[in-house]
A protein has these predicted regions:
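Positively charged n-region of N-terminal signal peptides that target proteins for export
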Residues: 1-4
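Bacterial N-terminal signal peptides
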Residues: 7-15
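Sec/Tat signal peptide C-region and signal peptidase I cleavage site
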Residues: 16-20
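A short glycine-rich, His/Asp/Glu-containing loop-to-beta-strand
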Residues: 27-54, 59-63, 113
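Short acidic-glycine-tyrosine-enriched beta hairpin
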Residues: 35-39, 77-95
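Histidine-centered metal-chelating micro-motifs
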Residues: 50-53, 89-101
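Glycine- and acidic-residue-biased ligand/ion/polar-headgroup-sensing regions
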Residues: 58-77
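Ligand-binding loop in jelly-roll beta-barrel domains
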Residues: 68, 95-118
């Protein structure tokens, strides 16, 4: 009985971990950390023609597209969205999970600025 409970708990933990995948860890071929501090993590993302990633997630982010490109995003529920993105385009992305794919015949590159969770502001000092 105890062994079964331990196995069940381990399976739940592994399933939860698999659902919350960091792009840099699960797909280092396409995702490179350029800069990181307590407020943001800045990623350079590069896909060759017709390359795709694996399912992963990002926090709320701002994307800056460096090249034109055609892409397809698949969400965990199987829905897909196709887009044509232009060099210089800037886009807000809510936090979420997806599997991205470069559907074009040319390399596709962007910078993604991931926002880290904000801490509550410190209380101002008060005079005594």
């Amino acid at each position: 009985m105890r062994r079964s409970l331990l196995l069940a708990a381990l399976l739940v933990l592994v399933s939860f971990t698999a659902m919350a995948q960091d792009a840099v860890k699960v797909d280092p071929k396409h995702y490179k950390v350029e800069q990181e501090n307590s407020q943001v993590r800045i990623l350079r993302i590069h896909y060759g023609p017709h390359e795709k990633s694996v399912m992963h997630e990002h926090p709320a982010s701002v994307a800056v597209f460096l090249t034109d490109g055609d892409s397809k995003f698949t969400t965990p529920d199987g829905k897909t969205t196709e887009s044509h993105l232009k060099s210089g385009q800037i886009m807000w992305e809510a936090a979420g999970k997806h599997l991205p794919e470069n559907t074009g015949d040319k390399p596709f590159e962007l910078i993604l600025v991931e926002l880290k969770a904000r801490r509550a502001p410190a209380k101002p000092a008060t005079a005594k």
